[in-house]
Every structure is written in C-alpha cells, then in structure tokens.
Amino acid sequence: MIVQRLLNQLIAQDIRDFRVLAAIAKVPRQLFVDEAMAHKAWDNTALPIGHGQTISQPYMVARMTELLIQNDPAHVLEIGTGSGYQTAVLAHLVEHVYTVERIKSLQFQARRRLRQLDLHNVSAKHGNGWLGWPNKGPFDAILVTAAASEVPTALTDQLADGGRLVLPVGDSQQTLQLIERSGSQLTSRILEPVRFVPLIDGDVE
C-alpha cells in the first residue's frame, strides 16, 4: 500500500504523533500536484507546483505540523498556502485554519482543492504573508512554509500568549525555528537545517 509505505518512512524519520500520521493518510496528495507528477505524489520528496514554488516533502510537512500542534491550537495561521496540501493536513487537526498566499493563481487552485475535499474550516486570502492576517488574530499557532530572511515582527505580534510560531529562517543557510510566546516574552529554538523557497515580501496578481 503506497500510503502505508510513506507512513512507515515518516515513522522511521521519528514522526511519532499519531494525529499527524492519520491526517497525512487522509489527505490525497495526488490532488495537490500536476497530473504529470501524480505518480510521485506519495513519494517522500518535494515536488514543483509552478511559479517557482514547491509542495513540501511529506516529512517536512509532518515535522512542522507535529511541532505546531503540541499545545492543541484551535486557530492557526498558515503563511504560504501554495498547493493547499499543508493547509489540508492542518484542517484535519485544528478548529480553523487561516491561510495567506501571495500568488493569486495558486491561491485560487488551493481553494478549489480544499472545497473538493469538503474542508470548510479554512479561510483563505490573497496577500502578503510577511504581514500575516492581523484582523483575524491573535493565533494559537503560526506556520510559515517559505524561508524568511529574518523572523517577521508582524507574525510574532499576532501570536497569542502560549502560542507557537514554526518557520524556516535564513537565505542561503536556513534553519527551522520554533518561537514561543509567554506574555510579552519570546523564546526561540533552532531545530535543524532545512531548504525552502524564499518568503517574498509583497503579492502577485
């Protein structure tokens, strides 16, 4: 079974949260890639989705999701909808996902896929991810799916008390970071080296 093979690989890579594994099993990744790539959809690898963007490797989706949901967040902000795959995984795990995408055509396609899967606990908008979604915050958790050159202040400002921000940071050398808010204090942990497309300031029609 192709899905089980991927789950076994994720378990071997130390993904332990059964909720994350169950969500990944439920989301048909082939719907989120080009038809020509559908045969690779359940491979544990990143794939191109056009516009210089990618659908992240399932391991990285699982790893970031596992970090994000440790405190059982209800309202989550995702920066970089992309194909909508990570959005769909989150939608199986939290009460509501707010997601922002700077490339309008990607955002349109992602919305269509999420509707097709009857995932109605998602609010999506076209906009500049560096700015977050201030009038919907604060958020219990924020996930960024592209590498910011530095941690965006607008995002830490939109993090609720006890909230978590998971994001890749850096230019040529990138690291996955976990930032947690306790009152007015922010603590940051560097977790592992990663490779993501850059988080670009601005939006595109």
UniProtKB/Swiss-Prot annotation:
Database matches in InterPro entries: PCMT, SAM-dependent_MTases_sf
Known catalytic reactions: [protein]-L-isoaspartate + S-adenosyl-L-methionine = [protein]-L-isoaspartate alpha-methyl ester + S-adenosyl-L-homocysteine
Keyword terms of this UniProt record: Cytoplasm, Methyltransferase, S-adenosyl-L-methionine, Transferase
Primary site of residence: cytoplasm
GO CC aspect terms: cytoplasm
UniProt keyword annotation of Cytoplasm present: yes
Active-site residues, Swiss-Prot/TrEMBL: S56
E.C. number(s) listed in UniProt: 2.1.1.77
SUPFAM superfamilies tied to this protein: S-adenosyl-L-methionine-dependent methyltransferases
Any one GO molecular function term: protein-L-isoaspartate (D-aspartate) O-methyltransferase activity
Keyword Electron transport tagged: no
Annotated localization: Cytoplasm
Enzyme class, broadest EC rank: transferase
GO annotation (BP), single: protein repair
Family matches, as Pfam families: PCMT
The protein's role, per its UniProt record: Catalyzes the methyl esterification of L-isoaspartyl residues in peptides and proteins that result from spontaneous decomposition of normal L-aspartyl and L-asparaginyl residues. It plays a role in the repair and/or degradation of damaged proteins.
NCBIfam families named among the record's database cross-references: pimt (TIGR00080), PRK00312.1 (NF001453)
Assigned protein family: Belongs to the methyltransferase superfamily. L-isoaspartyl/D-aspartyl protein methyltransferase family.
Classification via PANTHER family: PROTEIN-L-ISOASPARTATE O-METHYLTRANSFERASE, PROTEIN-L-ISOASPARTATE(D-ASPARTATE) O-METHYLTRANSFERASE
Protein name: Protein-L-isoaspartate O-methyltransferase
Gene, per the UniProt record: pcm
